[in-house]
Amino acid sequence: MSLDRNMSHKVYNFDQVIDRHHTHSFKWDNVTYPANSDMLPMPVADMDFVVADEILVALDQITSHGILGYSIVPETLKEAAQSKIARDYKWSTSLDSQVWIPGIVPGITAACAALTNEKEGIITAVPVYHPFHLVAGWVNCPLITFEMIKDGDRWTFDFEDFERGLQKGPKVFLLCNPHNPGGTVFNESEIKRIVELCAKYHVTIVSDEIHADLRLRAASEHISIGRFEQQPIISFFATSKAFNTAGLGGAVAIIPDAALRDKFIKASNGFFSMLSRHSIEVMLATYAFGEPWLNQLLPYLQANHDLLYDFVQSTPGLAMQPLEATYLAWIEYDEAILGDFQKKCWNAGLHVLRGEQFKGRNFVRLNFACPRSVLEKAINRMKSITNG
């Protein structure tokens, strides 16, 4: 596939509003929305921005070729992922350690199916991305949770509570780094402590690192769990979240230990689909050409974050920690002041996710990866609630 490198000089317009209605959008065409409503949907973690031109060209070239058969994962894609992980996350991996999969949630499910049983299950911190706690039911294993805590202006682990949970005998620790919904990019000392504790109790770390490229101003670098590996681990990476191609799927599991890798592959037999050619070519284009688009996106997201943060911090009954990564604001509300804030948002025409979905009471999660005019409209709808 041939792409024009001159595209990298383009200035992208993230203020452009694209109508996503009637595109089968999971976010915008939600069947539960009132008919003909002006609902602003801010629950689902995809972005309302047009992707990089090189991605669109890659898709056009596939379509013009006209054949959409089965595909293999080319060496060029494996090498591109390996290079990115080494360059951006400072982790040297082998090509043999890669297992290409349709998505990270199926990968997490396969990992838990491979490593747990009816008596020895999963431990994870809460609040957390909901598949992390739902997967225990999917694979029929116990779930142990421990609470995240506020440390100054960021969320982190209560490591004493974490160790108490590890003492109960789980087989897998599910880590979300950067954290969804807390927005934390775990620092080196935190990552080392996680690795040390899991090694002490012989617990395999399964790490979802899909938000690694969505670091905002407060975060200097993403530290992958693999940099301090003391025992077998599974780390998942994907370009889909940061480059807004989630609908195409595609991810890679890095599993350096051969025996663990074999277990993972056997557990996934029968329910992983092959990667489509669309997914493969888009990932290749993203690895090769996506960085200029991302470099323009991140300051725009930071400005959106700051606009929302300033509103929240100035509003009685609302609070949030400034995010280090992601575009998913985790907003706390005082029920005594605001009542059922999520329901009031819905009634005002704003759809945000209820915190209980992540095991966090009196919170909502709001996706601010949208044109600024749309975010301003959402803030005005929240003002109509909080000023009333």
Segments predicted by a language model, with ranges:
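Conserved glycine-rich beta-strand-loop-beta hairpin in the small C-terminal domain of fold type I
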Residues: 284, 300-309, 320-332
